Design a protein with these regions (language model features):
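Short loop/turn segments that connect beta-strands within beta-propeller blades
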Residues: 99-103, 143-146
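Beta-strand-rich domains and repeat architectures in extracellular enzymes and scaffolds
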Residues: 36, 60-86
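Bacterial Sec signal peptide processing site at the extreme N-terminus
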Residues: 17-33
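Conserved beta-strand positions in repeat-built beta-propeller and related beta-rich domains
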Residues: 87-91, 131-136
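Beta-propeller fold detector
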Residues: 46-64, 106-115, 148
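Structural signal for beta-propeller blades
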Residues: 94-95, 138-139
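Repeated scaffold domains used in trafficking and secretory/extracellular systems
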Residues: 69-78, 115-127
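Sec-dependent bacterial lipoprotein signal peptides
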Residues: 1-20
Length: 148
């Protein structure tokens, strides 16, 4: 009986340690520069450098309320160190911050930057922030929104 209890305890310890999750920390997901992506006729952008494709028609509709506003446009995307994606385009008033969830980009934050729409936004890494430059205006963003 005593041997049975010892064996059961050993198996329990082994079972518990085998079920613990593995977490790799100090990971940096940041892209060094933004991707400027042409939108195809179906509303998709493909970034071969980072191996993803996404349909952005819903994003352009959210921004403009026009289902064809993506035509002949480019989307600007960059990823920060935590793995959040920042997306905007010329004419957008907002920057959209997404996280990946179950195979989809899920909106985390929508940040209003220019009531009239940005002319030529450009994004860069400025750790721990993403910097957005639009003409003379510069903004620092993180996954929670605009740095105050």
């Amino acid at each position: 009986m005593k041997q049975f209890k010892i064996a059961a305890a050993v198996l329990l310890v082994i079972g518990i340690s085998a079920c613990s999750s593995l977490k790799l920390t100090q990971t940096d997901f940041a892209w060094p520069v933004e991707s400027v992506l042409k939108i195809d006729g179906k509303g998709n952008v493909t970034d071969n450098r980072f191996s993803y494709t996404v349909n952005v028609k819903p994003l352009f509709f959210e921004e403009t309320q026009d289902s064809l506003s993506y035509t002949s446009k480019e989307l600007r995307m960059i990823r920060d160190a935590k793995g959040y994606y920042y997306a905007t385009a010329a004419g957008f008033k907002n920057v959209y911050i997404f996280q990946v969830n179950d195979g989809a980009f899920t909106l985390s934050e929508k940040v209003m930057l220019d009531e009239k729409g940005m002319n030529a936004p450009v994004m860069n890494q400025r750790p721990p922030y993403v910097e957005l430059i639009n003409g003379a205006n510069k903004y620092l963003l993180n996954n929670e929104g605009l740095k105050k």
